Amino acid sequence: MRILAINIQNFRKLLQCHIDFSKKITLFVGANNSGKTSAMDALGKFLADRRFTFNDITISKRSDINQIGDRWIQEECEEPVDLAEWESFVPKMDMWLDISRNEIHYVSGIIPTLKWRGGELGVRLAFLPKDISKLFLEYREAYFAARKTEKAKEKVEIRLYPKNLCEFLEKNFNTYFSIKTFILDPAKAEADEPQSTPFEMECFTDNPLKGIIKVDMIDAQRGFADPDNADGTERTKKQLSEQMRSYYDKHLDPEKSPSPEDLDILQATEEARKAFDRNLAIKFEPAIHELEGLGYPGIADPKLTIATKMSTSETLKHDAAVQYALSKSDDSLKLSEKYNGLGYQNLISMVFDLMRFRDDWMREGKAKQAKQGSDWAIEPLHLVLVEEPEAHLHVQVQQVFIRKAYDVLTNHKFIKENENFATQLVISTHSSHVARETNFADLRYFKRLSEGSESTIATSKVINLSDVFGKEDETDKFVTRYLQSTHCDLFFADAVILVEGSAENMLLPHFIRNKYPKVYQRYISILSINGRHSHRLNPLIEKLCIPTLVIADMDSAEKEGHHKAACPERGKGLISGNYTIAQWLVKEKDLDRLLAIPSAKKEIIKETPYKYSIRVAYQTPVTIDYDGTVKEAIASTFEDCLVYTNYQLFKEISTDDTGSLVKR
C-alpha cells in the first residue's frame, strides 16, 4: 500500500494543487512563499488531527462566504438543508491510494463498490459545516442581536461583532466545522479536474484512514534557542532529554507490563525506596516529636509517617539527563545537552524523532502491551513529514541526513520482512544541497502564480519533475548529472541566467552587483553550462516556467561542409554554429540575418497560466574608433565582444613583468 497522489483545494495558497507521491521519498522544493509549508500543513491537519483555523481557507474565497452570509440575513431566507454550496469554498484534500488485492481487508470500510478488487482507491476529506441548520440559525441570532444593540443608542458608528459571516466563523471555526470524508470514484482518478463531492452518499464523520495510515511530523520550528533564555518552553519540548523520557515511558519503562528481564531493576528500585524511607524516618523524627508535644496525634488520631514513591522514569526528569562528555580521559568533564551546538542538537533531535516514529509504529517494547484491541494492529502505511531539516546544519550534514533518513525509518526487522508495510517520507526544503542528494524524479516543484493567473490573489501550483526529460535518454542523463553536481539552487530562484563559458560565469555576478542594483536584489541563479548545452535545459525551463536569459556565443562557422569555425563577417554566407541560437530560440542560422534581428524578436513570451519569457543574448556589431578610423567589429565569443565594447578601456591597460594588468 502506498499514497499515489493528493489533490489539495482551497487551502491557503493552494487553490487547486495536485501532488504526485514517490514510492519512498518525495521532496518539496520551490522559492520562498511558494506553498511548500501549506502543503505540509494540509497533510498534518487532514490526516493528523491538527487544528484548522479560518485563515486556512484561501483568502479569495472570503467574499463568496460573505455572500452566503448576506443571503442568510434576509428575512425571507429559508433554512439551508445541504452542503453543496460550500464545496467550492472550504479546504479539501483528495487522497489516492494504491491497494493490492491482499490489502483489501485494511480498507474494507471505504471500498467504492462491491465489485472493486484493488488498485486505485480515493477518499476526499473536506472541512465542512457539522450542522448547516445550526450554523444558519446561530449566525442569524448573533447578527441580528448585534444590529439591535447598535440601534439602541444614537450617534454610535461602531460595528459590533459579527459584521459578516467570515468574522463569525473566524471565532468559531472549529465549533461549527469538522472533517467529513467521502469515497471517490476510481474510474475518474485520472481526470484533469477533481470530481464533484458525492453528497448523495453517506459521509464519514470519524477518520476512516485511522488504522490505515500512521502520520508523524517534524515541524520546521523545532524550538532550539539560547540555552540561557528565560523563555525556554519551546526549546524544552525538543531537548533530547525530553525526547528520551517520552521514549522511555512508552517503550522501556519496566513498571509497565513487567517482563522477567525487568525484575532486577524493579527489585533494586524497591530496595532503594525502603532505604530512603528509613533515612527519612530518622531525619524527620525530631519534627514529628515536636508535633506530638503539641498534642498531635491524639488517642484517636492516625499516626504521622513519611513515605516515598520511586519510579525509574523519574530519574530522567531533569534537564541534565543527557550530557556530552568533553574529554575521553576525564569523565567528570561534562556539559548538559543545551550547551551543545544548535546543528548537532537539531540533527540528533531529528534522527531520534525518526527512530521514535518507527518504534511507535511497530509497537516496540512496552508499547506492544499498552495497545489494546484495534489500537494494537500496526497500520500498513507510515507517512512521515519533515519540514526544513537543513536548519543549523552545514552542507555535509544536510546531505548525510537526507541520505540516511529513510534508512532510519525502515531499519526494523519486521518492516524489512513484510513488504506490505510501507513507509513514505515527505520533506520540504529550501536547501539546494538537500535537493542535490535526491533523485530528480522525486522532486516536486512549487511554482508561484501571479495575481490574476487563476485567482484574484497569488496562488501556487505543483510541477512533477519525474518525466521532464523523458526516460533515460542522453539529455536526461546530462541534465540530471549536471544539476545534481552543480546547480540545484535553480529550484529556489525567481529567475535564471544560462551562460556557456567560465568568463561569463565569473564576470556576470560582478556586472550585476555593480551596475544593476535592482537585479542584484532578486533571487537569480546563474548556471554555467560549460559548453553549448543550454538547449538541453529547455524541457526543465518549460516545466518550471521560470524567466530565463540565455547568454550564447555566436560561434560563426562556414555554411558548407563540416561547418568549420570562421571569423564573423557580413556578406560571407556564414552561419551560427550554436544550436541554442539556430534551432532553439531564434531559429535562424544565417549570420547576416542574426545580426539584423531586433531585440524584441530575441524574446519568447510564453502565454501560459504562469506567463514567463525566455530571452537570448548573443554578440552584435560594435562600432569602435580604431586608430582614428570608425569601424564595425563583430565578435564571435563573449570575451571578444567584451574587449570590443570596452576598446578604449583595454587600450589603456598593459601588463607588468608578473603578468598582472596595470593601467597606463
Where are these regions (language model features)?
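Extended hydrophobic secondary-structure segments that form protein cores and membrane-embedded regions
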Residues: 216-218, 380-388, 424-429, 525-529, ...
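Short helix/loop capping segments that flank catalytic or ligand/cofactor-binding pockets
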Residues: 38, 104-106, 135-136, 208, ...
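Extended helical coiled-coil dimerization/tether regions that scaffold
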Residues: 220-386, 407, 413-416
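Glycine-rich phosphate-binding loops of NTPases
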Residues: 58-255, 259-263, 470-474, 567-604
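Switch/communication elements of ASCE P-loop NTPase nucleotide-binding domains
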Residues: 1-48, 317, 323-473, 477-486, ...
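Acidic, divalent-metal-binding catalytic cores of TOPRIM
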Residues: 448-664
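Short beta-strand-centered segment that lines the nucleotide-binding/catalytic pocket of NTP-utilizing
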Residues: 51-62, 447
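Short glycine-/polar-rich loops that comprise or flank the Walker A/P-loop
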Residues: 89-93, 118-123, 211-215, 380-381, ...
